[in-house]
């Protein structure tokens, strides 16, 4: 494996806010960088880059045109331009399976010259750059046409109807006229299976007027009403994603609804169904409630993985009978990625998850590595099956853009952070034809790597600011800013008698209220006046002295003079504690019982006025004698 990897130079295609360029490395221990002989074009308007599946061609848009380059395996060879296509607004690019054709898609637009609109899906022959097909395709989500593996069949869905074009040897019509059609209802979807020639194909029809949604399998060219190979119907499906295995013998359907009528999920609900070209169909059993995050086929075409359920989600490996053959357990993950040989799988949690990545040996069912790839928006295995790249790209994240290359053991092989003010928009590996690399032998040996230049996030638990000083044994109030007024003493600004008259009045009312409750609610037993202890300090200021000289002297109102003022001890409640602070447990109990007696007194008044009381209120009145005895006992013990 190592020898094969050294013979082929790994190349990364990079699209940024300033250029489209290719980077390469001389080996696993050498850094990735742009070589002088590799293409680099400065452009701020590139929207798409694309390799053909066999790695022969590389295409990109630059805002003026689309260029197609011929790729080279030689580390010293250049990449010549094969053709230039006049598509300045190209938004998506896609090669046919063998790289003979390039499809371009751009946003549909209407102009004064062409009010009916211009074709926005075009197909070009790569060798000559000649346009061979053009059509209006308004659907952006499912714009990609379908191809058979040998490129003999070209198909696409327009307005819910699937159109087929025969391009094989001896075909007379080619792209000029459709050879077959199927469907016709709105929202239809088509997918041609790989591997077989002629291929199997799946056509999905959404449900309408109470009829269920339906997916049918056909063997091309037998597309008649009674020529279906398999059929699967389901009611809960507003949308479906069709996933073929590499051999084209099995199809997975990920169905989803936009709204969950049960209210269990904000994002609707999902289900996974399996269809085989032999005619078998079944639903994939899921043992945990919640959404289906990811479904992926193994390149071996005999197994598939499903990541599902509320967080922490579950991940399980299934066989072609839809039986669970291995359970990866639960964890913070929502993505799964098989390497090109299917002997390694990476389970990851990206998006709103912290970026934990687990690498598993699929054949031995054991975990090989745990690593953290925070803020990852792109994950892709290298064709050699041993490396993978992770990247943080815009517009998903516009800060800390860059990419890293890892070995499956978790070792970091390369790291490049994008310069400040620039954005990394896209990155992908050069593809290679089958059997270019041999399947790697998986070992537990740790690979030598480099240390990341990015600081690691703190693993300590978050502590709120108001608790940080308490953990250090300090009083937080000591560090709070104190209010101050120029020319006044600090204590006066903090709330002396004359510093804030409203606060002083509130304190007096609070103190009188507390004493009223203790004395049974008699207002005449309240203290004469509550004196703020900060007042003498505040009056030391010249400003307050002058204010006191001008202030008229008023005697306290007689209604607040207590009848037993001379008999009250100096430290009685209300005088010793003007703000109602530091009261004893016994005083607190007296307050509570007095409050209950006050409520009973009000209830009795309401009853005497003819008001009908509730049963619990009548029971409360019956407790009056018990509360009076309790209050008497508390006062005697005091």
Curated annotation (Swiss-Prot):
Establish whether keyword Protein biosynthesis is in the entry: yes
Role summary: Functions in the early steps of protein synthesis of a small number of specific mRNAs. Acts by directing the binding of methionyl-tRNAi to 40S ribosomal subunits. In contrast to the eIF-2 complex, it binds methionyl-tRNAi to 40S subunits in a codon-dependent manner, whereas the eIF-2 complex binds methionyl-tRNAi to 40S subunits in a GTP-dependent manner.
* One Pfam family of this chain: eIF2A
Q: Please, one GO biological process term?
A: translational initiation
- Give me the stretches of Basic and acidic residues compositional bias: 441-450, 583-593
State the PANTHER family in the record: EUKARYOTIC TRANSLATION INITIATION FACTOR 2A (PTHR13227:SF0)
Repeat region (WD), residues: 287-329, 331-370
State the organism's lineage.
Answer: Eukaryota, Metazoa, Ecdysozoa, Arthropoda, Hexapoda
| Any one of the GO CC terms | cytoplasm
What is the official name of this protein in its record? Eukaryotic translation initiation factor 2A
Tree of life domain: Eukaryota
């Amino acid at each position: 494996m190592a020898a094969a990897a050294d013979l082929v130079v790994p190349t990364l295609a990079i699209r940024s806010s300033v250029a489209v360029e290719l980077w390469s490395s001389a080996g696993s221990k050498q850094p990735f960088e742009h070589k002088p002989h590799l293409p680099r074009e400065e452009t701020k308007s590139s929207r798409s880059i694309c390799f053909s599946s066999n790695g022969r061609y590389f295409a990109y848009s630059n805002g003026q045109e689309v260029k197609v380059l011929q790729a080279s395996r030689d580390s010293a060879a250049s990449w010549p331009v094969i053709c230039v296509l006049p598509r300045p607004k190209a938004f998506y690019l896609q090669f046919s399976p063998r790289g003979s054709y390039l499809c371009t898609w751009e946003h549909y637009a209407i102009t004064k010259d062409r009010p009916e609109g211009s074709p926005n899906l075009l197909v070009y022959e790569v060798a000559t750059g000649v346009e061979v097909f053009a059509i209006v395709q308004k659907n952006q989500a499912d714009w990609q046409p379908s191809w058979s593996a040998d490129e003999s069949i070209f198909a696409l869905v327009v307005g819910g109807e699937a159109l087929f074009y025969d391009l094989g040897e001896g075909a007379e019509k080619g792209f000029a006229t459709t050879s077959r059609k199927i469907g016709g209802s709105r929202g239809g979807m088509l997918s041609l299976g790989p591997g077989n020639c002629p291929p199997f194909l799946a056509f999905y029809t959404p449900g309408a007027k109470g009829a269920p949604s339906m997916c049918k399998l056909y063997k091309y060219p037998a597309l008649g009403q009674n020529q279906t190979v398999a059929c699967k119907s389901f009611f809960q499906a507003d949308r479906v994603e069709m996933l073929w295995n590499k051999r084209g013998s099995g199809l997975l359907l990920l169905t989803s609804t936009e709204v969950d009528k049960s209210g269990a999920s904000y994002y609707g609900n999902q289900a996974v169904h399996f269809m085989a070209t032999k005619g078998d169909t079944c639903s994939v059993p899921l043992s945990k409630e919640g959404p289906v995050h990811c479904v992926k086929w193994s390149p071996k075409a005999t197994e598939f993985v499903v990541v599902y359920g509320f967080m922490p989600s579950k991940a399980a490996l299934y066989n072609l009978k839809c039986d669970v053959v291995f359970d990866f357990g639960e964890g913070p993950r929502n993505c799964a990625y098989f390497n090109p040989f299917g002997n390694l799988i990476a389970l990851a949690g990206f998006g709103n998850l912290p970026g934990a990545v687990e690498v598993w040996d699929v054949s031995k069912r054991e975990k090989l590595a745990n690593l953290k790839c925070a803020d990852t928006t792109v994950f892709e295995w290298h064709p050699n099956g041993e490396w993978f790249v992770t990247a943080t790209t815009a517009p998903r994240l516009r800060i800390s853009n860059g990419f890293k290359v890892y070995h499956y053991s978790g070792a970091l092989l390369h790291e490049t952070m994008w310069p400040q003010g620039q954005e990394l928009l896209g990155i992908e590996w050069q593809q290679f034809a089958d059997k270019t690399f041999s399947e790697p032998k998986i070992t537990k040996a740790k690979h030598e790597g480099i240390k990341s230049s990015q600081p690691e996030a703190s693993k300590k638990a978050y502590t709120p600011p108001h608790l940080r000083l308490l953990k250090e044994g300090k009083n937080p109030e000591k560090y709070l800013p104190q209010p101050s007024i120029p020319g006044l003493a600090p204590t006066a600004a903090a709330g002396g008698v004359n510093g804030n008259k409203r606060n002083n009045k509130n304190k007096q009312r609070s103190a009188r209220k507390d004493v009223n409750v203790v004395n049974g609610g008699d207002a005449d037993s309240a203290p004469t006046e509550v004196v703020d202890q900060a007042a003498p300090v505040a009056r030391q200021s010249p400003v307050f002295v002058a204010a006191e000289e001008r202030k008229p002297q008023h005697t306290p109102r007689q209604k607040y003079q207590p009848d037993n003022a001379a008999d009250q001890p100096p430290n009685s409640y209300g005088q010793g504690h003007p703000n109602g602070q530091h009261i004893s447990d016994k005083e607190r109990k007296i307050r509570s019982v007095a409050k209950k007696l006050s409520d009973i007194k009000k209830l009795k008044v309401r009853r005497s006025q003819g008001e009908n009381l509730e049963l619990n209120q009548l029971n409360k009145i019956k407790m009056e004698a018990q509360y009076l005895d309790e209050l008497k006992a508390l006062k005697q013990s005091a």
